[in-house]
Amino acid sequence: MATRILGIDPGLRTTGFGVVECEGSRLHYIASGTVRTDALPNGDLPGRLKIIFEGVREVAARYQPDCAAVEIVFVNVNPQSTLLLGQARGAALAALVSGDLAVAEYTALQMKKAIVGHGHARKEQVQAMVARLLSLPGEPSRDAADALGLAVCHAHAGASQAAIAAVSPLARRAHAQYRKGRSY
């Protein structure tokens, strides 16, 4: 059975989205794009958050994903930028959970490592690898590529979790302890 995953790369001006379908180890591109708020004046934060909330909710309603993957906000040098990005992320998360979607969260480093092979990849490298992994005719925009990368990262994480669940109870317990930060 195929699982449809919606990836979200939150941003106050541009929020990227990407939808992939995972069937076994095969990934299929469904859609990608952006929710843009740059038509609004800079000071209209509530208006921007409303557009993000409604845009993400509309994307989820249109593509009917089974789950979502959202990028975790990193702490920037500028605390004000971090707070604003966190609010954009909150609007996207609220839209997803209002539709009863399960949401997984990944850092940019985790996503880049899953897509490119190392966590310090440049945006252009993510764009190129996403296009290659999903057999796209061209490279998606940076924000859409990051969102697709999050969806692919979640698909890979799900496959890993299923493989772990198939092994012995001791291995499952050890993995669960490892994920909680404990080791044996």
UniProtKB/Swiss-Prot annotation:
It is an enzyme of class 3 (hydrolase). Homodimer which binds Holliday junction (HJ) DNA. The HJ becomes 2-fold symmetrical on binding to RuvC with unstacked arms; it has a different conformation from HJ DNA in complex with RuvA. In the full resolvosome a probable DNA-RuvA(4)-RuvB(12)-RuvC(2) complex forms which resolves the HJ. This is Crossover junction endodeoxyribonuclease RuvC. Disulfide bonds: none annotated. GO terms for molecular function: crossover junction DNA endonuclease activity; DNA binding; magnesium ion binding. PANTHER family: CROSSOVER JUNCTION ENDODEOXYRIBONUCLEASE RUVC (PTHR30194:SF3). Binds 2 Mg(2+) ion per subunit. NCBIfam families: ruvC. Mg(2+) 1 binds at residues 9, 143. It comes from Methylibium petroleiphilum (strain ATCC BAA-1232 / LMG 22953 / PM1). Its EC number is 3.1.21.10. GO terms for biological process: DNA recombination; DNA repair.
